[in-house]
């Protein structure tokens, strides 16, 4: 029996998490208000407040594993990164082989931010393909709107309904959702967990990019290689208590310390006004040579703060959101766009296709997670021309029906 999801890959969380906007077609969903609580309901420090130590989140074994995975060879076609995986233990799914179209039940944490919206659009276009091919009859979806209790009720509703041939679960948080995931497993139907993890190994597969430590290593090494000992980095963080975000900072902080970089971090709630205020205050006390972010929300505001102050632009890491890529090109700053591979939203449905065919799949399906470099930026800008600022460059849906219009128009089901 493989180890628990938590111990093998710690917890995977979304890149841009936990704004409280409900499922809606309102265009304002692109810029939801900042969350007031963390993933498990803990109070979030006031925006602009420095964080406490990240030591409790640092795990050397997981750090080393994800560092190694950054250079791993992935099985599968690089043109289909959403199907690639690192070679490892496989799950025999022959017991789940089925004839005819099957019903999927999807319990989603939310679509409350642009990263999740982009993935949700892609997932629905992938669903259309599998419906047309007769693999899936329908996907009944319940959106928890970033609330643990709602998602627990959603999963229990699916179980009581007794009409699901398979479960797909993107957990809102780790510990709180574990019992509900286990109850879904007890139905005897295949369960797929993706994006963020839970503390059980009962799922047929856990799908996620490499992880938070890999993000932290990519970004902190990039900044450290370009800065000198004693240079100052301002780290902008969305909120505390979300494992993958904490892991990003835990890895980055360790690397900054090793390289003598003076790094100070603040929680921002992804509020552009607060981000500008933090940076303005830091610039008023001295030079800032680098900006590090645990997610790209507010990256443009950070750059604009330097422009408003007439200060030299920093070395900076953002994310593969189009707003950052465009501002990066416009300003010519020295930057890197780390990713939390948005194309992962296709993988659960493609995994179901394999499961219903009785094919083996990875027990832990680790997807590629490669940042966008300056040399690659132009390629991704061209490929995503016409996409809205909230779109994510590595969304992986170019071969799906509706491309590019569905994503350009942000047609959120």
Range-by-range predicted roles:
Residues 1-21:
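Sec-dependent bacterial lipoprotein signal peptides
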Residues 2-5, 22-413:
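A residue-level marker of the well-folded mature domains of exported/periplasmic proteins
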């Amino acid at each position: 029996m493989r180890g628990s999801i938590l111990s093998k890959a710690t917890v995977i969380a979304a890149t841009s998490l936990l704004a409280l906007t409900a499922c809606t077609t309102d265009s304002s969903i692109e810029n939801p208000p900042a969350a007031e609580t963390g993933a498990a309901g803990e109070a979030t420090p006031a925006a602009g407040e420095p964080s406490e130590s990240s030591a409790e989140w640092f795990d050397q074994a997981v750090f080393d594993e994800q560092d190694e995975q950054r250079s791993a060879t992935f099985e599968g076609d690089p043109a289909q990164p959403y199907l690639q995986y690192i070679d490892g233990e496989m799950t025999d799914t022959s017991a789940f082989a089925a004839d005819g179209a099957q019903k999927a039940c999807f319990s989603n944490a939310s679509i409350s931010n642009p990263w999740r919206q982009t993935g949700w659009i892609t997932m629905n276009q992938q669903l259309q393909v599998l419906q047309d091919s007769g693999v899936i009859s329908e996907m009944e979806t319940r959106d928890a709107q970033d609330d643990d209790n709602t998602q627990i009720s959603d999963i229990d509703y699916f179980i009581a309904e007794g009409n699901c041939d398979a479960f797909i679960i993107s957990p809102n948080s780790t510990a709180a959702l574990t019992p509900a995931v286990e109850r879904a497993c007890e139905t005897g139907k295949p369960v797929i967990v993706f994006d963020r993890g839970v503390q059980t190994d009962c799922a047929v597969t856990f799908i996620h990019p490499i992880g938070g430590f890999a993000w932290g290593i990519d970004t902190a090494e990039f900044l450290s290689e370009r800065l000198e000992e004693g240079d100052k980095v301002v780290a902008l963080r969305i909120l505390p208590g979300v494992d993958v975000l904490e892991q990003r900072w835990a890895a980055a902080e360790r690397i900054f310390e090793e390289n003598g970089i003076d790094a100070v971090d603040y929680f921002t709630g992804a509020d552009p006004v607060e981000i500008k205020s933090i940076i303005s205050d830091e610039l008023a006390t001295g030079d800032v040579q680098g900006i590090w972010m645990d997610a790209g929300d507010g990256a443009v505001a950070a750059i604009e703060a330097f422009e408003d102050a007439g200060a030299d632009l920093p070395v900076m890491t953002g994310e593969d959101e189009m707003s950052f890529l465009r501002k990066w090109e416009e300003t010519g700053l020295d930057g890197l766009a780390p990713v939390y591979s948005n194309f992962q939203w296709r993988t659960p449905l493609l995994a179901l296709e394999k499961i219903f065919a009785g094919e083996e799949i990875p027990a832990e399906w680790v997807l590629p997670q490669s940042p966008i470099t300056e040399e690659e930026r132009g390629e991704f800008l061209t490929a995503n021309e016409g996409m809205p600022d909230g779109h994510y460059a590595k969304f992986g849906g170019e071969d799906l029906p509706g491309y590019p219009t569905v994503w350009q128009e942000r047609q959120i089901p």
